[in-house]
């Protein structure tokens, strides 16, 4: 039975990846920080909804990306054949408020894991979660694996470091270490501070009579949005091929926040203009340009392709947030 280790297992991507690997018969180990409260809402269903389904094949370990000794301990204990490094301080706007912490966790956390692989001597394959935010002030459209990086946030800068140190260790030590340059990917498990989930969550609260307003920043910002559940399949595929490499994972489509508002509010028959208020605090100090990824390489070499359209993604998110609010999406949505 293959063993996999996931950092950031309690996040959107980590929880979907854990489910995928468990379905494929893996023993899955995840790392969580010890804290006074635990964010386990995304992974608790795996444990409790059907406890016999995975027969104890999901285990959690205490550790921290700021603590190299904990990473060494976990790798020596687990000896995973595959490592998926998803853990990070991943909110772009917040990275301007805590740049040093972002650099430490998102940037240096990567080299701590790579060094732990070397020090423990385990034979493993490594996946690094890179980001389209590395392109920032884009140098060409669409972006490919060879497009120069020009990050526009502390988060983007930290991810550039993580990308290049992964490439460096691959070349210097012969590691099977791959970068997945993932463009924006959303789901009902997306954190509520991210704009897409903030929109769909607020729609549900509006219909439940709990709020009347949605505060947003730049409505003209454009992103290449995909479905997180599709994207974790690409992560797994990267570690199944003989040679490590770097891949753009994207839909090759771009949509504005304004379009997301049109689609999501339209599903429940509401005009978003009646609820949205522009708040300057949600504008980034430096905004990225047009992010649109070309996934041709991943499609050709891995056989991966996005399965879920933009409209389908928005529908999934609105549907699930209405359910979470105790509402009936079948009655409220234009399906």
Say what each PLM segment does:
Residues 17, 23-24, 30-38, 55-59, ...:
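C-terminal substrate-binding subdomain of Rossmann-fold SDR/epimerase-dehydratase oxidoreductases
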